[in-house]
Amino acid sequence: MSEGLLAPISPQPIPDMVFDRISRAIIGGKLQPGQRLNVLAVAEEMGVSQTSVREAFLRLERHGLLVKFPRRATLVRTWNRTDLMEIASLRASLEGLAARLACANLTAEDSAALSATIAEMEAAVRREDHDALIELDLAFHRQIWAIADHRLLEQTLDGMKLRTRLFMTIVRGYDVVDYPSQHRQLLDALRSGDAEIAEQCAISHVVEPAELALEAMPDQEGLVAAAVALRTQAGY
């Protein structure tokens, strides 16, 4: 592994911090799909115990960011069209439900908080800070989850947050200049008080960039079928 990808952790090895550092390196593209990770090498580079790294690897496997083959090295997972469709369709359905519920609960204070997050997105666009945009995108949606006031839905979406961050990284070819306006449209839909409009806007907010990402993937065979399947699965 090349030097400097994962900064040392001090003074004590903390499995949660190891997990966070590695997941951020994967999502940020510092660790590439298919790249081999070795427990000993990672432990030495990060300055932590092998036990901490093994624990982090197991959690990352459960979250779908790493894959381990029997008697072989652990690899950063390579994502294909099916993976993207599954993430997008599930997230679109859940985000649609969250928007539908949030529409009925939205207060003036909630609206102002969401608008403030969009303003931060606009500042991130001016700085050309895509990493900040991904975090702000997720923050915006987490605000909606909270407003929806559906504990199990929020827990389910929160459990997908690493896959959601990775999804956002995969679709980063989508015009980031449009990020604030896309979120403004979703906020306007919530403010409309029309649950159907809010739900469909939230679904399209996920599906449309996913379709662009599908188009950019190699092997165009079955692309139309994949796009149709995505819309069908998402109820779009």
Pin down the residues of each PLM region.
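Short helix-capping and inter-helix turn/linker motifs at the boundaries of alpha-helical repeat units
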Residues: 13, 111-112, 174-178
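Short linear motifs at protein or domain termini
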Residues: 1-100, 104, 109, 214-236
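C-terminal regulatory/effector modules of DNA-binding transcriptional regulators
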Residues: 45, 174-236
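Conserved amphipathic alpha-helical segments that form helical-bundle/coiled-coil interaction surfaces
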Residues: 87, 108-169, 181-188, 197-207
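Hydrophobic residues in alpha-helical segments
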Residues: 26, 102, 125, 190-193
